[in-house]
Amino acid sequence: RVAGDDFTSDIEEYMRRQHNILIGERTAEQIKIEVGAAIDNLENPPNDYAVRGRDLMTGIPKEIHVSYKEIAHSLDKSISKIEEAILSALEMTPPELSADIYKTGIYLAGGGSMLRGLDKRISIKTKLPVHIAEDPLRAVARGTGIALKNIDNYQFLIKA
């Protein structure tokens, strides 16, 4: 399982390894929001982002600028894990559901789904249409609520 928190950790690690700068989780989260991307060829790329942190060599605070392309590179391994999990799930999908997915596409939900270009990258990998759910931050909770209200209709989804 890979989620937005993994992306944040990837960014922290990238800043430490590539720029010798120590940043906190909040700064990494802000980088993800401001310049986070899943691909390095966005049609409308964000401007570079100024990052402030502590220089690991001198211990003195410093500022650097990072591009969305750098962040896309830093997130590549985690995004590849997501792609592989999706492909694995598709391989195990019953034929009737596969037909529906082929027709309607894949829907992404959660905060990580808002990463620029993630839908495009997954679409290229799966050769299927990929959409971001309406209100992706609340989509999973809303869907779970609907399923619980109609538990008899969704009993087949519950593992014993």
Label the model's feature ranges.
Residues I11, I86, L108, T144:
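Residue-level signature of catalytic and energy-coupling elements of molecular machines
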Residues L22, A50, Y107, H131-I132:
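Structured core elements
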Residues S74-I101, A147-N150:
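Phosphate/ATP-binding catalytic cores across multiple sugar-kinase/actin-like superfamilies
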Residues G4, T8, E12, I79, ...:
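Short, charged, low-complexity patches
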Residues I21-E25, L90-S98, Y154-I158:
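Active-site phosphate-binding and catalytic loops of NTP-dependent enzymes
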Residues R1-D76:
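Phosphate-binding glycine-rich/basic clefts of nucleotide- and phosphate-handling proteins
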Residues K120-I146, Y154-A160:
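Conserved phosphate-binding/catalytic loops in two-lobed NTP-binding clefts
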Residues A99-I122:
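Glycine-rich phosphate-binding loops at beta-strand->alpha-helix junctions
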